[in-house]
């Protein structure tokens, strides 16, 4: 049974959740759900998701966390679960038996199966986490942050993503309370932080990029609220932005790094040991290494058992327990890790390899820019040209940005096109949806790139 309080805004849902867990557990038991069965949870609304998740745990079934998907039937074909939980009208949870799976081979220590973020135009993969890895993540993350029983944590992202699942693990390990914001309006967030005595906040860059302008506008310092740590997953915030945040709140934003395949946390900044512009130091027990092209490799107790599909767990991509992350990174002499960008995101411009994350970090230092994403627009002879989608002040012009970065990056790294937009599209885990932006750029600038 769930061992912590749950609030939406200032309203407690704990009693309702516990009651519905009991009811769903009885219903699942009546349907024949038993230990080791795979139960797909195709729910995105947080309260109903918690009910289904903990009902699975009561019966020692293995949750297969699908979350919000457009084509559920296709996902069910991939995961080959024994049962599926979903919500009908008015968030009523349904449990349905699926066709009998005759052939399935998954390790006996599988504790959970979750999916990678995918994108709006890409199919996600499913990852099997071990019971031991889940326990390791709970214990090590608790050790890093010093969480205490009864403290309250505000979380703004989906619980069914890898980030959310790690938060749920920490909450149950420490009997901490979960606060889900009723909305993301800055004034409402501050009210909830005050009334709920929130100690920890976990979110993504878009949350902080919304909050900081409000704090400046209202000239509102929030040191007195008492938040111990502001965590950030997804993409990195700039050094300048974090400094401005500290000026207004008195507490740094703690960037970290993880990926679903690693269980998820790999490296974290600590409240007592952090370095701006980095993702902190690896967890104790987590090993990291670098290939010749600076790709980051990880080995830890929580690295996935393998990718799961069609009743099988495939661990062929692991090499003696080492996971290729696909991210380029460095580690300095003090042990802090810096993520340079995704290897697969590299854009070839006139024969040069350009990291869009490097260009983005440079552009973000402009005082009038809140966020940016850079993608490639195909060109028949030059490989690609760069297009920067910029979120910034209304007075911002393309010439302003060009002049700002002219002497800061080499010529291949300078965008040919700029598009000023109100906000960047994001995936459920808070990361920028680059596939969507690339599709927009090709439609908007594809013909222009031919000249």
Q: Residue ranges of each PLM-predicted region?
A:
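Conserved AMP-binding/adenylation subdomain of ANL enzymes
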Residues: 135-152, 160-200, 210, 214
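Conserved ATP/PPi-binding loop(s) of AMP-dependent carboxylate-activating enzymes
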Residues: 278-285, 291-320, 352-354, 396
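AMP-binding/adenylate-forming catalytic core of the ANL superfamily
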Residues: 201, 294, 300, 306, ...
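Gly/Ser/Thr-rich phosphate-binding loop
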Residues: 198-203, 212-274, 287
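Conserved AMP-binding A3 loop
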Residues: 13-16, 111-139, 269
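Conserved AMP-binding/adenylate-forming
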Residues: 27-70, 155-158, 353
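Flexible, low-complexity linker/hinge segments
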Residues: 89-111, 138
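AMP-binding/adenylate-forming catalytic domain of the ANL superfamily
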Residues: 409-432
